[in-house]
């Protein structure tokens, strides 16, 4: 199962990021001390006309923002001309190992399509030895930089991996590339772009953990979803010593999600029959598709399906084109409660041509004491 994650730190994302603007002041009221927190929320937005073409040169006055139905004041704004940050995560495992050069060329094409001033970080999956065992891990090959020569040289260093730590890779990106939890600054246009089939094979973390961390980061997520199922299933059948197989973690996840009450749970791949292998494959691919759609929608990103890596470069061009037309605005929420509740975001347009449409993140979870 292969996976290329392009982390595209894109300010204009259609995502909403809850950020702590400054350390909350303490206000003393007689015998009670009340903590007030001022939070900056980032909202990446894509705006198109009725024909689907991007609407450029919009101003803060063209946007109305509501949180849980209450109007908010736009305090920060990034236009489509301001630079963004991109982290490129490449996973060359499983069915894509033989296409390493194709992956490298597609990634190089994506980098070349970015504008001057846009910064990129390259993160890759690789095979490492831990406690005497060969495992797949993620590795930050370059920090954020606009040095195109350095980035292209780094692409030549990308190697193959014996697994897909998909969730671990996303968490690593949030922490090591984006700097972990939101800080007190308006971060602008950021995004994650992932070229992957989305099927995790070796992560220690799970989807819910990733979803929560991405939501807190406010980074939009884009997927170039490569269909590897047919190839993978062909390699699954027959001799259990085949080059492709389910990891123990995948098999356990399959039973936990789809058959939680089953008493017969086989974790040894070699003890699975062909019918069971195909059922696991079908279920995990469907789950991966659902998770990608969820992450993209919640963050204001998008999924771009492709049937093979040969189509990846054109899909990257589409992603880059959309990222280049994103806006990002920020507001200080009038709801200062630290209750961990989910806050719904609604953005409306005014003073734009009839039929204009927008896509933005639909909400965020507030901090909790």
Regions found by a protein language model. Give the residues of each.
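Bacterial N-terminal signal peptides
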Residues: 2-14
């Amino acid at each position: 199962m292969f996976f290329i994650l392009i982390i595209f730190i894109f300010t204009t994302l259609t995502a909403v990021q809850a950020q702590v603007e400054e350390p909350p002041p303490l206000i003393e009221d007689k015998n009670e001390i009340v903590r007030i927190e001022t939070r900056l929320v980032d909202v990446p937005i894509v705006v198109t006309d009725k024909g689907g073409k991007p609407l450029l040169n919009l101003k803060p006055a063209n946007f109305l923002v509501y949180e849980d139905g209450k109007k908010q004041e736009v305090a920060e704004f990034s236009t489509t001309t301001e630079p963004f940050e991109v982290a490129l995560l490449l996973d060359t495992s499983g069915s894509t190992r033989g296409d390493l050069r194709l992956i490298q060329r597609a990634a190089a094409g994506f980098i070349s399509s970015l504008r001057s001033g846009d910064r990129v970080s390259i993160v890759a999956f690789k095979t490492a030895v831990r406690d005497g065992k060969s495992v797949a891990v993620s590795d930050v090959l370059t920090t954020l930089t606009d040095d195109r020569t350095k980035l292209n040289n780094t692409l030549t260093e990308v190697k193959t991996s014996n697994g897909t730590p998909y969730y671990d890779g996303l968490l690593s990106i949030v922490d090591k590339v984006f700097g972990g939890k939101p800080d007190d600054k308006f971060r602008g246009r950021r995004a994650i772009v992932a070229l992957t089939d989305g099927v995790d094979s070796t992560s220690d973390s799970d989807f819910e953990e990733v979803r929560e961390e991405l939501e807190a980061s406010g980074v939009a997520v884009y997927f170039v979803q490569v269909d590897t199922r047919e190839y993978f299933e062909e390699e699954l059948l027959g001799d259990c010593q085949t080059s492709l197989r389910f990891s123990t973690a995948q098999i356990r996840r399959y039973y936990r999600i789809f058959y939680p009450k089953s008493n017969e749970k086989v974790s040894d791949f070699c003890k699975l029959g062909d019918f069971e292998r195909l059922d696991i494959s079908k279920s995990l691919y469907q789950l991966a598709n659902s998770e990608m759609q969820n992450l993209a929608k919640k963050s204001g990103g998008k999924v771009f399906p492709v049937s093979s890596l040969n189509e990846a470069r054109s899909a990257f061009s589409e992603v880059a084109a959309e990222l280049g037309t994103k806006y990002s605005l920020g507001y200080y929420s009038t709801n200062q409660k630290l209750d961990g509740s989910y806050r719904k975001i609604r953005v409306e347009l005014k003073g734009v041509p009839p039929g204009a449409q927008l896509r933005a993140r639909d909400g965020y979870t507030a901090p909790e004491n």
